[in-house]
Regions:
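Soluble small-group transferase modules, centered on the S-adenosyl donor enzyme superfamily
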Residues: 43, 112-192
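The AdoMet/dcAdoMet-binding core of the Class I SAM-like
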Residues: 1-86, 93-102, 107-109, 122
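Short catalytic-loop micro-motif centered on adjacent basic/acidic residues
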Residues: 86-88, 114-115
Length: 192
């Protein structure tokens, strides 16, 4: 799902980008939807076993609404009983209060929120939230052939050093947009 049809067209038609994404847009498992994710979830009755929520960072109120309790409530309604959603949640190192605001907001709608982080070469230390209806239990074994993830490395994803530990934050709601304010203040310190 992407709001901009030109983005999905570009990545589904440009030969270099098709090669880079291994022709993912042409897989029979993929259905491209160009719509506002918030509105689409409100109007859609499908259930999902897995959702990747990879929105741009909450730099303004239009994007901030996609990180609100209202949005996560819609997501909760669309997840199957054993469904999982992974949510891009900014950097717990550079935007610590923003990150924990997202975790708290996911929890506020009754979803289990499992915070984790990983080093992403193009972004640095980056945070995610695994949202589910049941508490997440880490697998004991992982599929063969994975390049980076294993039973030995996975536990480190869920360990937060002292400078990324939880901090107090408000639930992000449509009527307060707390996350947008946290995000703006924190990233201004990093990129003046």
């Amino acid at each position: 799902m992407d709001l901009d049809p030109e983005m999905t067209r570009l990545f589904s038609q440009n030969p270099r980008l098709r090669q880079l994404n291994q022709d993912a847009f042409h897989s029979p498992k993929v259905r491209v939807v160009n719509a506002d994710a918030f509105v689409w979830l409100e109007q859609n009755a499908e259930f999902f076993d897995f959702a990747v929520v990879d929105f741009p960072d909450p730099t303004n109120h239009s994007l901030g609404k996609l990180y609100t309790s209202a949005f996560y409530r819609l997501l909760d309604k669309r997840l199957s009983a054993n469904g999982l959603a992974v949510i891009q949640s900014t950097s717990p190192m550079f935007a610590r209060q923003s990150y924990w605001c997202i975790v708290k907001t996911v929890q506020s709608v009754g979803l289990c929120a499992t915070p984790y982080h990983v080093y992403v070469p193009s972004f640095g230390e980056w945070g995610f939230v695994l949202a589910s209806k049941q508490p997440f239990i880490q697998p004991v074994q992982y599929p063969q052939g994975l390049r980076f993830l294993s039973a030995d490395t996975a536990p480190n994803l869920f360990q937060f050093p002292k400078d990324m530990q939880p901090v107090d934050a408000e639930v992000n709601r449509l009527n307060n947009q707390a996350l947008v304010h946290y995000y703006e203040a924190e990233w201004q310190k990093v990129t003046p």
